[in-house]
C-alpha cells in the first residue's frame, strides 16, 4: 500500500460515518436515546439535554469495516493485530454501550457501577495480553528517544491492564464538550499512524489508526458545536482502549503519555481536584475535568475546544519527533 491507499483509508472511513449519520441520528432520537446532563455541570450545558447519544456505534462500525477492507490491501494482510484491535475496540465499545443503554433506556443516571465497569475493562485487557503473549509478544519496554530498554517480565501484564483501563477512563473524561474528544483523539491516532507508517513500520496498525482518524473526522461533522449527536461512553471507552492497544502493539507504551498528553492532563486535573478537596476542603479548579474549569472562567465552548485541539497537536508533534525525527 502506498500513500494513496492511506488517503483512501481516511476517505472511506469518513464517508461511511457521514453517510450513516443522517440515518442513525434520527433513529436514536426516535428511540429517545438522549443524553442526560449533570445538574452540577455548567448551566450552559443544560440545553444539550436530550441530544442523541451512543453515536460511538457509527464510529466503531466505520472503523471495523474500513480496517478490514484496507488492511487486506497491505503486504501483511488481515493479521492477528487487526483482529486484536477490533476485539479491543468492540469490547470496550460494548462496555460503553451497556453503560449508555442503562442510562438512557433504563433511566439509571449512573449507568454501570464503577466496579462493574472496572471488571469489564480488566477482563478485556487480560484477554488482549494473553493473546499477545501467545503470539510471542515481547515484554520489553523501550524509553523513547534513547537506547534504553527493560524487560519487565510478568509485570508487563500489570502494565497492559493499567494502560488500557487508564487510557479508556482518561479518554472518557475528555468527552465533555462538543467536538473535544473527536478532535483530540483524531490528532492522537494520526500521530500513531505516522509513526506506524514511517517509524516502526507496521502498515496494518497505520491503516487501523487512519480508519479511526477518518471515522472521527466524519463524526465531527455532526459533533462539532452545536452537536447534533454525542458519541457517549460507547465511543469514548472504545477509543481509549484502542489507543492503548495501538501503543502496546507498536511498543510505544511510554510515548502514549506524550501523544495522549491532553487525556493525561484532563485526568490529572480530576485527581488533583479530588485529593485537594478531601485533604483541605478546597478546590484547585472551578470544576474538573480541566475543560470545564475554562468554561467557568468565561471561555466559550468553541474556544476551549480549539485550544485543547492545538495543545493536542503540539503533544502529537512532539511524540512523532521523538520517535521518528530523532
Curated annotation (Swiss-Prot):
Catalytic activity, EC = 2.7.8.13
The name this protein goes by in its record: Phospho-N-acetylmuramoyl-pentapeptide-transferase
Instruction: Report the subcellular localization.
Output: Cell membrane
Primary role: Catalyzes the initial step of the lipid cycle reactions in the biosynthesis of the cell wall peptidoglycan: transfers peptidoglycan precursor phospho-MurNAc-pentapeptide from UDP-MurNAc-pentapeptide onto the lipid carrier undecaprenyl phosphate, yielding undecaprenyl-pyrophosphoryl-MurNAc-pentapeptide, known as lipid I.
Q: Which organism is it from?
A: Oceanobacillus iheyensis (strain DSM 14371 / CIP 107618 / JCM 11309 / KCTC 3954 / HTE831)
Q: Which family does it belong to?
A: Belongs to the glycosyltransferase 4 family. MraY subfamily.
User: Mind telling me which Pfam families this protein's record contains?
Assistant: Glycos_transf_4
Biological process, per Gene Ontology: cell division; cell wall organization; peptidoglycan biosynthetic process; regulation of cell shape
PROSITE patterns to which the protein is assigned, alphabetical: MRAY_1 (PS01347), MRAY_2 (PS01348)
The cross-references to HAMAP family, in alphabetical order and at most eight, read: MraY
Q: Name one GO cellular component term.
A: plasma membrane
Known catalytic reactions: UDP-N-acetyl-alpha-D-muramoyl-L-alanyl-gamma-D-glutamyl-meso-2,6-diaminopimeloyl-D-alanyl-D-alanine + di-trans,octa-cis-undecaprenyl phosphate = di-trans,octa-cis-undecaprenyl diphospho-N-acetyl-alpha-D-muramoyl-L-alanyl-D-glutamyl-meso-2,6-diaminopimeloyl-D-alanyl-D-alanine + UMP
Which of the seven top EC classes does this enzyme belong to? transferase
Q: What is its main location?
A: membrane
Q: Which gene encodes it?
A: mraY
Amino acid at each position: 500500500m502506498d500513500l494513496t491507499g492511506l488517503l483512501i483509508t481516511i476517505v472511506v472511513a469518513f464517508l461511511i460515518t457521514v453517510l450513516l449519520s443522517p440515518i442513525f441520528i434520527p433513529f436514536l432520537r426516535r428511540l429517545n436515546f438522549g443524553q442526560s446532563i449533570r445538574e452540577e455541570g455548567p448551566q450552559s450545558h443544560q440545553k444539550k439535554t436530550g441530544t442523541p447519544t451512543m453515536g460511538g456505534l457509527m464510529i466503531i462500525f466505520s472503523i471495523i469495516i474500513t480496517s478490514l477492507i484496507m488492511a487486506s490491501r497491505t503486504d501483511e494482510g488481515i493479521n492477528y493485530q487487526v483482529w486484536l484491535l477490533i476485539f479491543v475496540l468492540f469490547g470496550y465499545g460494548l462496555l460503553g454501550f451497556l453503560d449508555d443503554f442503562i442510562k438512557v433506556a433504563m433511566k439509571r443516571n449512573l449507568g454501570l457501577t464503577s466496579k462493574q465497569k472496572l471488571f469489564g475493562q480488566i477482563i478485556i485487557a487480560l484477554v488482549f495480553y494473553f493473546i499477545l503473549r501467545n503470539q510471542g509478544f515481547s515484554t520489553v519496554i523501550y524509553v523513547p528517544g534513547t537506547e534504553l530498554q527493560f524487560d519487565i517480565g510478568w509485570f508487563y501484564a500489570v502494565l497492559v491492564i493499567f494502560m488500557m483501563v487508564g487510557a479508556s477512563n482518561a479518554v472518557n473524561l475528555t468527552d465533555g464538550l462538543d467536538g473535544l474528544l473527536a478532535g483530540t483523539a483524531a490528532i492522537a491516532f494520526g500521530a500513531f499512524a505516522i509513526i506506524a507508517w514511517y517509524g516502526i513500520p507496521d502498515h496494518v496498525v497505520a491503516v487501523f489508526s487512519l480508519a479511526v482518524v477518518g471515522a472521527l473526522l466524519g463524526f465531527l461533522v455532526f459533533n462539532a458545536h452545536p452537536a447534533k449527536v454525542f458519541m457517549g461512553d460507547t465511543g469514548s471507552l472504545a477509543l481509549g482502549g484502542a489507543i492503548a492497544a495501538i501503543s502496546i502493539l507498536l511498543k510505544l507504551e511510554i510515548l502514549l503519555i506524550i501523544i495522549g498528553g491532553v487525556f493525561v492532563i484532563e485526568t490529572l486535573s480530576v485527581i488533583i481536584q479530588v485529593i485537594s478537596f478531601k485533604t483541605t476542603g478546597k478546590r484547585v479548579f472551578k470544576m474538573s475535568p480541566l475543560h470545564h474549569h475554562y468554561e467557568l472562567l468565561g471561555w466559550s465552548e468553541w474556544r476551549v475546544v480549539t485550544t485543547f485541539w492545538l495543545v493536542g497537536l503540539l503533544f502529537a508533534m512532539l511524540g512523532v519527533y521523538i520517535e521518528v525525527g530523532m
